[in-house]
Design a protein with these regions (language model features):
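Bacterial Sec-dependent N-terminal signal peptides
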Residues: 1-23
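Short loop/turn motifs that connect adjacent beta-strands in outer-membrane beta-barrel proteins
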Residues: 22-34, 62-70, 96-101, 146-149, ...
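Gram-negative/organellar outer-membrane beta-barrel architecture
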Residues: 27-38, 43-184, 266, 281, ...
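C-terminal hydrophobic structural anchor segments
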Residues: 293-326
Length: 364
């Protein structure tokens, strides 16, 4: 298992409103007002050695309505002294008075990753690493349909993954794992969402419920034929002034023949915090988590969270005894009072594991 040798730390952060919107009356937000926030970071792990990077968010309104959702572009990247690098850009653009939503994901990386096998009880292995080159491009376009706050539309997902060095990983060296040499996945599908949140950065009321189906096929240029079903349901309750209870159910199911790197991956900085992302993987991934958010002093806030989740090969193989806990706490710093945009640091714990996460925006 990956051991974190020195935690990610904040050196300094900068915030700008260099592109102020023109003065308007108090019930509108001017089109074109652009704000941004950026932060550098440094961390060390045995796999990466020293790594230096930066992240940030650019956010703006493309509508002149007061309650319109802000479009935003988040980005992060790092480079290590042993020549690994990772760059991710996530634009989310609201158009035509929020009636259209274009969200994309771009990622390019050459990094060490980990593979411990497939299943809920996959054991630790000595040589768990491999070196990969990865390119991801996901595009989702949704249009308002049937009623306000309900959107649906198409999805396209493309991924090219090359296993450049198996690093003696016995599971990949056996060539018995589907996708052990990498490959291309190309999928087309649709997505439907119902979003009643009162704020996309820090919801205090409402919910976000999303369902998607994506089909990957050789007819679309994919090396693998499979399908993916994803349900993400979040609810937000204001218990007291500025005290928020948020909870989420997350379910992913795959059919067909997905490669090992496209299986449902447990862990990471959003769901099941405390576990290395992908430490456990399979065709089914289900998780439930809750988080309590409250203010402390000035712009600082505090959260506690807990959850349960696991992976399985099929529904009949789900075992209560292998369900894994996730719990922890975090600190928030409000970088924009108007939009309720936070910088977050979370410390998560799992079963014999832990993780530290640093980002902009809430985990969910």
């Amino acid at each position: 298992m990956k051991i974190l040798a020195a935690i990610c730390c904040l050196i300094f952060a900068v915030q700008s409103q260099n592109f102020p919107q023109e003065e308007t009356n108090h019930d509108t937000i001017g089109v074109g007002g652009v704000n941004w926030f950026a932060y550098p970071f440094i961390f060390f792990t045995p796999e990466t050695d020293w790594a230096f990077g930066a992240g940030g968010i650019l956010y703006f309104n493309l509508s002149d309505q007061l309650k319109s959702k802000p479009s935003n572009i988040t980005a992060s990247g790092y480079y290590t002294v042993n020549k690994q690098f990772d760059l991710t850009v996530l634009p989310e653009i609201y158009l035509n008075q929020d009636k259209f939503l274009l969200s994309t994901k771009f990622n390019y990386s050459e990094i060490y990753d980990f593979f411990y096998g497939i299943g809920s009880t996959s054991p630790d292995i000595a040589n768990n690493q491999y070196f990969q080159r990865n390119f991801i491009l996901n595009v989702k376009f949704q249009a308002e349909a049937l009623k306000k706050n309900f959107k649906l539309g198409p999805i396209y997902e493309l991924r090219s993954m090359d296993v450049l060095n198996k690093e003696g990983n016995p599971l990949l060296d056996s060539n018995e794992v589907l996708g052990s040499n990498g490959g291309i996945t190309s999928g087309l599908g649709f997505i439907a969402s119902y979003d009643t949140r009162d704020n996309i950065f820090y919801p205090s009321n409402g919910g976000f419920h999303q369902f998607s189906i994506t089909y990957y096929s050789k007819a679309l240029g994919s090396d693998f034929d499979y399908s993916k079903y994803l349900l993400d349901s979040r609810t937000y309750l204001s218990l007291f002034p500025n005290h928020i209870l948020a909870y989420q159910a997350y379910i992913m199911i795959e059919f067909g023949y997905p490669p090992f790197y496209e299986l449902a991956l447990l862990g990471g900085d959003k769901v099941m915090r405390g576990y290395l992302y992908g430490r456990y993987r399979d065709r089914i991934y289900y998780a439930f988590q809750a988080e309590y958010r409250l203010p402390i002093i000035w712009r600082f806030g505090f959260v506690v969270f807990g959850g349960l989740g696991d992976v399985a090969s099929k529904v009949s193989k789900i075992e209560i005894s292998t369900i894994k806990p996730s719990y922890g706490f975090g600190v928030r710093f409000r970088i924009d009072e108007l939009q309720k945009l936070d910088l977050r640091v979370d410390v998560g714990f799992g079963r014999d594991t832990n993780g530290i996460y640093f980002s902009v925006n809430q985990a969910f």
